[in-house]
Amino acid sequence: MLVTFTEAAATASTSSLISFSLSSPPKFHHKSRIYGCKATFGLRTKPTSWIAAASLSSSTTTTSSCGSSVFDPLGIEQDNSWGVASAWDGVLKFVSQTFESSSGTRKDRSSSARGVAAAIEDSSIDFGDFFKGPLPGKFLTLLGLLALSRLGIYVPLGGVNREAFVGNLDQNSFISTLDSFSGGGIGRLGICSLGIVPFINAQIVFQLLSQVYPKLQDLQKKEGEAGRKKIKQYTQYASVGFALVQAIGQVLFLRPYVNDYSTEWVLSSVILLTLGSVFTTYLGERISDLKLGNGTSLLIFTNIISYLPASFGRTVAEAYQEGNYTGLAIIVVSFVSLVFGIVYVQEAERKIPMNYASRYSGKSGGLQKSAYLPFKVNSAGVMPIIFSTSSLSLPATLARFTGLDILKKAAVALTPGGSFYLPTNILLIAFFNYYYTFLQLDPDDVSEQLKRQGASIPLVRPGKSTAAYIKTVLSRISVLGSGFLAILAAGPAVVEQATHLTAFRGFAGTSVLILVGCATDTARKVQAELISQKYKNIEFYDLEK
């Protein structure tokens, strides 16, 4: 719309002024206030002469601001109470300036506080900061709970020939691995020998069911923290059932080694083993409440650490008896190299840069440094190895109950050292790793979450294109993760064949992966706790100062 501004001359010697009234120009005199336009409209007049320019610059009342705040270009609304309006505008101007000054001060303090927070994150953490907060008390409570979890392992079941059972235990790689997870509880036949394994099995089952059963999937994703608490409660109930089934299976497995296999012994043993597993699961939940790491992982970490000296001692004794010092040196070097390799791969990640609609840093004016989407190289963890080991032990378990010759031959071929053990194990690990990677990270779900947050990948359209791009990245990462897990699973078998030492069989690469992963996770939690202690001293929005 084109608006034409006409000039109305007040006197012959004064400047020309803009008037928005097209019907009748107002009359001016030397004491009246001029109702024109504010400078914020960007409208300027051009004087007709240098005398008019001088007159315009000397008149402070005409060039400061307009008296009326109503934009009325057609002159429909006339305001005769110019004095009250001028006073009211003056009050509003003063109040607005006051609040703008207050807002500017708050922004300055907020930016300075964020600067202090960034300096805290970048600064190194002193060892003395550990004793300034609640961390010492939390660690003492953690050590007490872990020690309490170990007591049940040293309370054995009665009436079992332990020497004969331990001799057969070394020949079964799967049970040896479970024995390392329980900290030697299976070998000692303790009442807490099942440990946290039934709870882990229940978690695996519910993770698989959440992808098949839509109600569980909605409960996990759409209901937030309340839904996750319900799933956790269902998992705890299911772990009791798994503990009962595994206790019955362990009692049946112990039948050849029991002196008096009676109904009373079976019932009492099943009840004790089930209660021991429930007690261990309860301790794991209390450990998780300390927020120093996952309680399940810390329990397994403690059991593996306690199993390590005995396993290494048996390996050293076997090497000295056979005079195989070269094999012992190879095992030590392989173990150290394995630890460093696991640390490197666990910390490796694929970073996809992200663009956010409104996430900019205050100082530089550009995107924040953390504007990327990280994907771990080994996002599936140890679950593919556990699934593969369980699958390889299935023929031996079925052959024990059925007695079929074909199952016995398959069990011999799929045991460590068998002809089909390595290729079958690697293929199963690759399959389960690919499946479990996409079970944890759904590309469509990730794409939808990025779209809701206003984030996008550069040169990739939001929606289906983003989901396809993420799927391609995860597929390539799963190949690297499968190769890494295959080395972990097949490495101990290769070292065993090269050194001819079997005492270290139960302590596989899976155990080292759990140790390293749990240690790094706990270190991150402690560092986050120390940083949060320093954040408590920062006042981000303090208006009184």
UniProtKB/Swiss-Prot annotation:
SUPFAM superfamilies: Preprotein translocase SecY subunit. The chain crosses the membrane at residues 139-159, 189-209, 234-254, 264-284, 292-312, 325-345, 379-399, 412-432, 477-497, 500-520. It comes from Spinacia oleracea. One of its GO terms (cellular component) is chloroplast thylakoid membrane. The central subunit of the protein translocation channel SecYE. Consists of two halves formed by TMs 1-5 and 6-10. These two domains form a lateral gate at the front which open onto the bilayer between TMs 2 and 7, and are clamped together by SecE at the back. The channel is closed by both a pore ring composed of hydrophobic SecY resides and a short helix (helix 2A) on the extracellular side of the membrane which forms a plug. Pfam families: SecY. It is found in: Plastid, Chloroplast thylakoid membrane. It is a multi-pass membrane protein. This is Preprotein translocase subunit SECY, chloroplastic. Component of the plastid Sec protein translocase complex, which is composed of at least SECY and SECE. The keyword ATP-binding does not apply. Belongs to the SecY/SEC61-alpha family. One of its GO terms (biological process) is SRP-dependent cotranslational protein targeting to membrane, translocation. InterPro entries: SecY (IPR026593), SecY/SEC61-alpha (IPR002208), SecY_CS (IPR030659), SecY_dom_sf (IPR023201). The keyword Transport applies. It comes from the Eukaryota. GO terms for molecular function: protein transmembrane transporter activity; signal sequence binding. Keywords: Chloroplast, Membrane, Plastid, Protein transport, Thylakoid, Transit peptide, Translocation, Transmembrane, Transmembrane helix, Transport. Its main location: plastid.
